[in-house]
Amino acid sequence: MKISYHGHSVVKIETNGKVIVIDPFLTGNPKTDLKAEDVKVDAILLSHGHGDHVGDTVEIAKRNDAIVVAPFELATFLGWQGVKTHPMHIGGAHEFDFGKVKFTQAFHGSSYIDEENKTITYTGMPAGILFTAEEKTIYHAGDTALFSDMKLIGDRNDIELAFLPIGDNFTMGPEDAALAVKWIDAKTVVPMHYNTFPVIEQDPHRFVEKLTNCTGRVLEVGESITL
């Protein structure tokens, strides 16, 4: 299984001949190396409804006839736009032909903001994502604060690789993320959701250097890990 980081919270997974992308915020993302029109996928996994995570989902999904796996309200909202979806909710798991997906709790918001019409549409609860394929589990925390049930996520799952936000302001910052690392007990941790905008500027190398109970690794944009 090959896992690639493409800036902000964009993660691509290649496994068993399938390509899965998590939170494909590409257009308007100054930290990505991908262009929406070039992305070929079989499935898209979404953690929540904010624009910097849903991103180019509709265009990519329609062009590839890809399924979008998302929290129920967000899946419904995208389905109304002609996207093929599979709705789920926190605590639920489903076995797809590309791997197993389970949604976990995340402490954040989830909405679609229409700046032009000044409206906000509720898109359900935010989620973290546990993805399992080839007998290995990846945890993508989505956008979240630190919460104590991360201990439960770590206790109940043998997590090979975790992507955790460290940007602060909108999510947990480096100090809280370091505690999350201990609770999740992943073998390797990669920071995400930082330096895309001035308000979430952080030093990811400083973060991973302080980790003592796992392998911390900063992935440059476009860099991959093979599990």
Swiss-Prot record:
Family annotation (Pfam families): Lactamase_B_2
Top-rank lineage group of the source organism: Bacteria
UniProtKB keywords = Hydrolase
SUPFAM superfamilies membership: Metallo-hydrolase/oxidoreductase
Q: Name one GO molecular function term.
A: hydrolase activity
Q: Which PANTHER family does UniProt cross-reference here? A: UPF0173 METAL-DEPENDENT HYDROLASE MJ1163 (PTHR43546:SF3), UPF0173 METAL-DEPENDENT HYDROLASE MJ1163-RELATED (PTHR43546)
Asked if the record carries the keyword Hydrolase, the reply is: yes
Q: Which family does it belong to?
A: Belongs to the UPF0173 family.
What Gene3D superfamilies does the record point to?
Ribonuclease Z/Hydroxyacylglutathione hydrolase-like
What is the designated name of this protein? UPF0173 metal-dependent hydrolase Bcer98_3294
Q: Which organism is it from?
A: Bacillus cytotoxicus (strain DSM 22905 / CIP 110041 / 391-98 / NVH 391-98)
UniProt-listed InterPro entries? Metallo-B-lactamas, RibonucZ/Hydroxyglut_hydro, UPF0173, UPF0173_UPF0282_UlaG_hydrolase
- HAMAP family associated with the record: UPF0173
